[in-house]
């Protein structure tokens, strides 16, 4: 077995994970970063594939005849402090986009602009009338579960038509048990609800505008990594609090005095061997199919669409190339005769489909998209798996706070979306990494 690695820095702190948060912390602090993969960025990474090929390429070839995809689907940078957006732009010049998104009802071939509740005029008079009455006059009592919150917020009609079946798929069936989360994603404004029943309404929500690096997320990750001391191929298997050592899958170890961890909170608890009285909160995994195909005659222009259901089981379809044609092979960018797509399907955490199941699902998804005439010939079908993709909580759960508290007591600072078990975007994750990194910066003379 390799001898332990002794970090060559003053305060003995090391960073686990070179996703966006870990890279930001490493960039701001100068501390070493240990990453499981052989490249930076975590799930916020771009890759390339030639039509008809199964090989992932880390960079585009000179001729540009490749589709660009991302691990885990489209990661668009929304919100964020202006200072953070400037930081991103200096490292990787970015473009700004205005969201184009809809709820799509396949059986009716009906597109309703997002958010649904502000565009009731697209629905039938009967549905529109019921939905208005329920949203504006319904009692707003207490609720414990996401299901109860959805019914209280949107009424039985819209919950039955869209919000219920969508969240059944989005949460892999957990929506009837878990606590409500992220209400700002579906804001309720009575004036806009009424107005939207008869006329157009302005876009609202947390991601009406977003930015994305011109050369892909991998360009941002590489630029950040150049300012960091990143050790690749270091997958954490155990954290020994008594010996103050992190054990890696390759047999090596690293000593520390304190840790900055961006790894998922549940995984960190498991690897430390800590035992909590509270039952762990649930999570869902996501199987994302990245598809490159010739464009179908009914392919929408949306950046992404939400679905109340699909035969194959997916709940969201995103169109990389509708955001920017740079996701297409260079010969198709002027003609826009191809499309680069990501399709999301959720699984309860711990339930991993077999290779055979993934193949069957992939074939069923391609067939369904062809029936909808979104695509014609599929030239690339590439599945990616995100183990901890969405984090949830049980009603009244104190697991998250207890886990963070006990790790802090053992000199572990948890930072980032998955480490702190919250929903936040890339910009906020970079901000948190910079803050924590700066507070742990190596001492230097001014």
Stretches found by the model and what they are:
Residues 55-139, 165:
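Dinucleotide-binding Rossmann-like beta1-alpha1 core, especially the glycine-rich loop
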Residues 28-59:
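Glycine-rich FAD pyrophosphate-binding loop
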Residues 21, 39, 266:
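Conserved Rossmann-like nucleotide-cofactor binding loop
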Residues 64, 249-251:
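Glycine-centered tight beta-turn/hairpin loop motif at sheet-sheet or coil-to-beta transitions
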Residues 3, 394-446:
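C-terminal lid/capping helical subdomain adjacent to the catalytic/cofactor pocket in oxidative enzymes
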Residues 110, 126-244, 252-255, 262:
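Active-site/ligand-binding neighborhood in enzyme catalytic cores
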Residues 256-258, 267-410, 424:
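C-terminal segments that line or cap access tunnels to active or ligand-binding sites in enzymes
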Residues 6-33:
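N-terminal Rossmann-like FAD-binding beta1-loop-alpha1 element of flavoenzymes
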